């Protein structure tokens, strides 16, 4: 652990430009990434050194609002990076970017702290095991299965269901998961963070003591928030704070950790806000020139080692639904599986609005998932692709002009499309339909039967918003009885 200097290195604020603060020192300059401390309106304010400007001045990024700072105000060099509490005491707590509790439940009595910037694990320490993480969501498990210890990206524009999907994954995986979970809320809505916290309390993921108060003992999740209303410094670093907590559970306790990030785009966005203030020349579409470096520094630390694993699920906002935008495009290279949410599918009322032809996974290989699963997934995609290519003909000439074979393909594809929808546990309060968890074996068996035409006699409506194929048969009987 880095020791603080015996005599404190004190500087003074020379200028404040929004979230960026310049500090002048008479003696030695603090190192890049060092944390400096001052007070603002009676609160502790942390500044992170980003640049040495020369003439005894450093340029820093503020981790909180800078309103109220004045020139000449004293700033102290802590002699080390921003450090956050790590370990079991963080479980069941909500922390901010600098590791302070924001749940009004007193201090985090952690015995250890860790710096938020760290090197990625060495290649020799990384694990290469390939196994599937079952989510219970049909479209994901069948067509783009997730890797245990892998990186998963949920791509989607505004309002197509990224946060609901990430909450369902937390519900299906984290609640039944033996290890620990860490949730990093990066630049998203405070309301969603609040809802998530109460959901965790209700589900028992955050434990309560005899008086009904939340307690770290028995809790399985740590929450780290830097929400939309926070300055860019906090949003640019909060993902690293969350990751540092997850790394402790992986490296020291040897656990399999789930790391949820909502939203990685806000991490990039905060970096671009700060970048211009730091005097860097913007690159494509106004993003920071260090976009790939920033993303790489974060993503390379999220990995599985011989000690334990971190499986990360990251929501990634796609500006204007354009996947070629530099922010989502830079994320693609780091991911093992991508789940693309499509507005056109959500407009059909099919939820989750996952695009079955655009979502990919390196796990969809016969040697990992088995021959039957692989062939079923490819047959489903082939049927949907044929339907997609016939849509123009249908739009211009109508269904009657198609050959009998093509008509059958279209009917099956429409059933598959509806069968890929699924009621979610977290959406139960809005839809009134009970959520469903479908085992991967049932998913493969059901879709194989549909593709092979075993259920051609059932109506399309029976396939919508159900779990397994047994429910389809049940729903078809109900519909027939209602129509009679």
Curated annotation (Swiss-Prot):
Presence of the UniProt keyword Disulfide bond in the record: no
Reactions catalysed according to its record: ATP + H2O + 4 H(+)(in) = ADP + phosphate + 5 H(+)(out)
One of the record's GO molecular function terms: ATP hydrolysis activity
Superkingdom to which the source organism belongs: Bacteria
GO CC, one annotated term: proton-transporting ATP synthase complex
Topology versus the membrane: Peripheral membrane protein
Major localization listed first in the record, in broad terms: membrane
Subcellular location(s) of the protein: Cell inner membrane
InterPro entries xrefs: AAA+_ATPase, ATP-synt_VA_C, ATP_synth_F1_bsu, ATPase_a/bsu_AS, ATPase_alpha/beta_chains, ATPase_F1/V1/A1_a/bsu_N, ATPase_F1/V1/A1_a/bsu_N_sf, ATPase_F1/V1/A1_a/bsu_nucl-bd
Binding site for ATP: 156-163
Keywords: ATP synthesis, ATP-binding, Cell inner membrane, Cell membrane, CF(1), Hydrogen ion transport, Ion transport, Membrane, Nucleotide-binding, Translocase, Transport
Keyword Transferase: no
Disulfide bonds: none
EC number: 7.1.2.2
Functional summary from the UniProt entry: Produces ATP from ADP in the presence of a proton gradient across the membrane. The catalytic sites are hosted primarily by the beta subunits.
Sequence similarity: Belongs to the ATPase alpha/beta chains family.
Complexes and interactors: F-type ATPases have 2 components, CF(1) - the catalytic core - and CF(0) - the membrane proton channel. CF(1) has five subunits: alpha(3), beta(3), gamma(1), delta(1), epsilon(1). CF(0) has three main subunits: a(1), b(2) and c(9-12). The alpha and beta chains form an alternating ring which encloses part of the gamma chain. CF(1) is attached to CF(0) by a central stalk formed by the gamma and epsilon chains, while a peripheral stalk is formed by the delta and b chains.
The protein's name: ATP synthase subunit beta
Organism for this UniProt entry: Rhizorhabdus wittichii (strain DSM 6014 / CCUG 31198 / JCM 15750 / NBRC 105917 / EY 4224 / RW1) (Sphingomonas wittichii)
Record lineage: Bacteria, Pseudomonadati, Pseudomonadota, Alphaproteobacteria, Sphingomonadales
Gene that encodes the chain: atpD
């Amino acid at each position: 652990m880095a020791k603080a200097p015996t005599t404190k290195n004190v500087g003074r604020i020379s200028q404040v430009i929004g979230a960026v603060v310049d500090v002048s020192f008479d003696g030695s300059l603090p190192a890049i990434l060092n944390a400096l401390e001052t007070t603002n309106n009676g609160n502790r304010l942390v500044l992170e050194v980003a640049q040495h400007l020369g003439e005894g001045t450093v340029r820093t990024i503020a981790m909180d609002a800078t309103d109220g700072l004045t020139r000449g105000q004293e700033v102290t060099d802590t002699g080390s990076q921003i450090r956050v509490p790590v370990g079991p005491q963080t479980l069941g707590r909500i922390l901010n970017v600098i590791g302070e509790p924001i749940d009004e439940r007193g201090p985090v009595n952690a015995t250890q702290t860790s710096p938020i910037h760290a090197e990625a694990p060495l290649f020799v320490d990384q694990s290469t095991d390939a196994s599937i993480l079952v989510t219970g969501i049909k479209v994901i498990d069948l067509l783009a299965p997730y890797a245990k210890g892998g990186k998963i990206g949920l791509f989607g524009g505004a309002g197509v269901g990224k946060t609901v999907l990430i909450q369902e994954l937390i519900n299906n995986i984290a609640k039944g998961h033996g290890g620990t979970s860490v949730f990093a809320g990066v630049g998203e809505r405070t309301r969603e963070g609040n809802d998530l916290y109460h959901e965790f309390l209700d589900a028992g993921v955050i434990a309560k003591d005899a008086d009904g108060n939340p307690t770290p003992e028995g809790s399985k999740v740590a929450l780290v928030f830097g929400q939309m209303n926070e300055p860019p410094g906090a949003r640019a670093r909060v993902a690293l704070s969350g990751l540092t907590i997850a790394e402790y559970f992986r490296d020291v306790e040897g656990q399999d950790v789930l790391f949820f990030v909502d939203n990685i785009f806000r991490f990039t966005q905060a970096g671009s806000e700060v970048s211009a203030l730091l005097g860097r020349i913007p690159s494509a579409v106004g993003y920071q020139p260090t976009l790939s470096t920033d993303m790489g520094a974060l993503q390379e630390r999220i990995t599985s080692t011989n000690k334990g694993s971190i499986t990360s699920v990251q929501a990634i906002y796609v500006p204007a639904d354009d996947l070629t935008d530099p922010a989502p495009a830079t994320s693609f290279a780091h991911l093992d599986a991508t789940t693309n949410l499509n507005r056109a599918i959500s407009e059909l009322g099919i939820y989750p609005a996952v695009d079955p032809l655009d979502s990919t996974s390196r796990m969809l290989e016969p040697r990992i998932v088995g021959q039957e699963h692989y062939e079923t997934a490819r047959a489903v995609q082939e049927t949907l692709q044929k339907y997609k290519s016939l849509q123009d003909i249908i739009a211009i000439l109508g269904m009657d002009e198609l050959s009998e074979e093509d008509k059958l393909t279209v009917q099956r594809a429409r059933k598959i499309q509806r069968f890929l929808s699924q009621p979610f546990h977290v959406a139960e309060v809005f839809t009134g339909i009970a959520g469903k968890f479908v085992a991967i074996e049932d998913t493969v068996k059901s879709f194989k039967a549909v593709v092979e035409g075993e259920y051609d006699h059932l109506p399309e409506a029976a396939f919508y918003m159900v779990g397994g194929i047994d429910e389809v048969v049940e729903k078809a009987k109900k519909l027939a009885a209602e129509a009679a």
